[in-house]
Amino acid sequence: MRISLVTPPSQNVEPYIKVFESKGVKVDHNSIHPDADFIMMTTQAWLHLVDNFHNTFPDIPIVSLTLDFYKSIWNSPNPHGYNWNLYKHYLNKAEELWCISNEVITRMEEEGIDKDKCHLMKIWARFFEYEGEIKDDRYILKTIRPYKYDKNYGWLERACSELNIPLKQPNHGASEQEYHKLLAECSFMCSEYHETSTGGLGILEGYKLGKVSVVSDSPYHGAIDYLGDRAIYFDDKNNEKIKQIIKETWNNTPQPDLEDCINFCNNHPTIDDNVDFMIERMNIIKKRGQIE
């Protein structure tokens, strides 16, 4: 099998290439070969390549690893110049959509995209073994990057300011070593947005170290798929509720059983599981095409 993988730089997507090739799948990264079996798109970024490849080789089927699909982004200013209608066009054209949470599936269905083409594939997390001391240094950690157009943007910062609680936000600017230390030494984490496909995988990586997360109970928050009832939820409809939950969690910070946290995270899909799933789905599509 041979695929054209179209993706901008991504610490969770680019590592797939090596795993695909270890399993006998040739990957052309942001390029295409006439013998490709599939064009795999991943996001609205670099859609011009998908468009170019499809126009050059219109008979090569498209599949989509759909990482996110946010209404708040569609309706916001568009500084990157994304072509949303073209993105939706190719999602509709794709043979299958592999979605990393039910939030993604729900939003796409609301935009008229065929839900029957969607398959849930929870994305792998970058778990690590921490050699230092896991402790509570009394600060809240927000691992997810700023979503400035989300309706809940600023809720956490305002709550922490009013409660005089330290908040750390690396905004993807910390080194890997610094990031691991931030996770290992926080009191707990928070992912307050209304709309996010996973809640930020840091909430899962931190949970393996025994750190809990406060998250929105929005139906468009993907943490429910990744942490389930192991997260602490606040009422997404009321910005005062996050302040109340933050205060309660700060004053009585949960300390879950570390072994149980580790076992839970060890059952999360690995990068190999993700690649095996995608290969299996592509083989099914190929067989389906032969029958038709």
Where are the regions that the model predicts?
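Active-site proximal beta-strand in glycosyltransferases
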Residues: 38-40, 54-76, 98
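Short beta-strand->alpha-helix junction loop in the catalytic core
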Residues: 70, 103, 120-131, 264
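Membrane-proximal helix-turn-helix segments that form the acceptor-binding/catalytic region
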Residues: 77-97, 184
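Conserved donor-binding/catalytic core segment of Leloir-type glycosyltransferases
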Residues: 126, 131-151, 157-160
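A charged, aromatic-enriched C-terminal amphipathic alpha-helix characteristic of glycosyltransferases
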Residues: 130, 237, 251-291
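Acidic donor-binding loop of glycosyltransferase active sites
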Residues: 181-198, 211
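Short hydrophobic beta-strand element within catalytic cores of glycosyltransferases
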Residues: 212-216
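Conserved acidic donor-binding segment of nucleotide-sugar-dependent glycosyltransferases
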Residues: 228-239, 247-254
